[in-house]
């Protein structure tokens, strides 16, 4: 581990303790004229880095892959994945892990350059990234962080001064992504597919030591690992559902073992409440639709359990039984977390059957009347019932009476109920049309002020500030249907 005292780089490279089949050491491909267009000051400080130093030319060169900080050990990680149900051997095709930053408090975070050039896993890709998708990941990941949803984060975006070719010629960029780690379900699938039990054990042991040290002394630590990942993913997916977030590409290589949201390619936030909502242009069958996300998470975790079977128990039948038993617990854990969250969104403290009924009735009405998901809960939180089709309907008025009666009968005061609602119903989300406006201004006009203003508003989604109201307006019909693209 090497410390650079001026900037604060304090890099370690524990991933290289794994068998070399898990990665390929390769330097980033330099770019012609890098320019820093966005730096995350608060994240930099939390990592032990000095923002003013990071703005200097020598540090911008690091974000661009033209130079490396002391102690860096760039590598591309190997992994596999079920992509829309089809298994492939994959790997970092346009990203490099340059090291693991050890923070002043002793935490460890991967520092990854995304768009840093081709690797042995690029599969005919150019290894580069376009500015628009990198800024989009910055905006959405930081919005997720502010919403208190576990996520990878974005430290910096630099333009490369070079074009990137997709359907059209686009400005190139590199994103510096920060994550608890980049170990995925697909990493375990990769180890299992190669057939080496020793490699699989090495990966599991490393993962436990890094993310779940509390289970190292467990009688069967590999079963405990599966249990912990299931628990974290159940909590994560519930949090997605509660704010209307649609990931769009829940392939097994995009499911982290740490329980963080990763890969913001074709993601978006739901406007009108609809279980079938899909934004991704490549998800033509609706595999990863909003209502399918809990089921797809369970499916992905079943692939993790399959990969762990060789080390869950020496008897294969017993190992299979363990895997099945643990996976069956996901739905119960997810439902528990989701129900708890929905109760908070409606100011309900009790666990009784009427709470279930109130939640189900409201969601059915919201879907029937195509009500805006975020704004419906925002209006209920403010007790400001507006002139919408939902709120004007006779069935909602009846529901509202029942809900108010339930709030009146609780031991806790109504003030406490509304305060809980305020803390669990964001007044603002990264509305898709607002994100596109910010990206258009930045990419086309080199105007980052729209993005900065949006990021400022998104940084405190539970504030209910009058400054945020312009961002609460749903998209006009001309902005629909909204489509997202992975940007690869």
UniProtKB/Swiss-Prot annotation:
Enzyme Commission code(s) on record: 2.7.7.-, 2.7.7.108
What are the binding positions for Mg(2+) in this chain? 254, 263
Q: Which cysteines are joined by disulfide bonds?
A: none
Q: Record keywords: Metal-binding included?
A: yes
GO MF, one annotated term: ATP binding
Q: Which UniProt keywords apply?
A: ATP-binding, Magnesium, Manganese, Metal-binding, Nucleotide-binding, Nucleotidyltransferase, Transferase
Q: Which domain of life is it from?
A: Bacteria
Q: Which cofactor does it need?
A: Mg(2+); Mn(2+)
Per its UniProt record, what Pfam families does this chain match?
SelO
Q: Where is the active site?
A: 253
Q: Where does ATP bind?
A: 91, 93-94, 114, 126-127, 177, 184, 263
- Tell whether ATP-binding is among the UniProt keywords: yes
Record field: catalytic activity: L-seryl-[protein] + ATP = 3-O-(5'-adenylyl)-L-seryl-[protein] + diphosphate; L-threonyl-[protein] + ATP = 3-O-(5'-adenylyl)-L-threonyl-[protein] + diphosphate; L-tyrosyl-[protein] + ATP = O-(5'-adenylyl)-L-tyrosyl-[protein] + diphosphate; L-histidyl-[protein] + UTP = N(tele)-(5'-uridylyl)-L-histidyl-[protein] + diphosphate
Similarity comment text for this entry: Belongs to the SELO family.
Functionally, this protein is described as follows: Nucleotidyltransferase involved in the post-translational modification of proteins. It can catalyze the addition of adenosine monophosphate (AMP) or uridine monophosphate (UMP) to a protein, resulting in modifications known as AMPylation and UMPylation.
Q: What is this protein called?
A: Protein nucleotidyltransferase YdiU
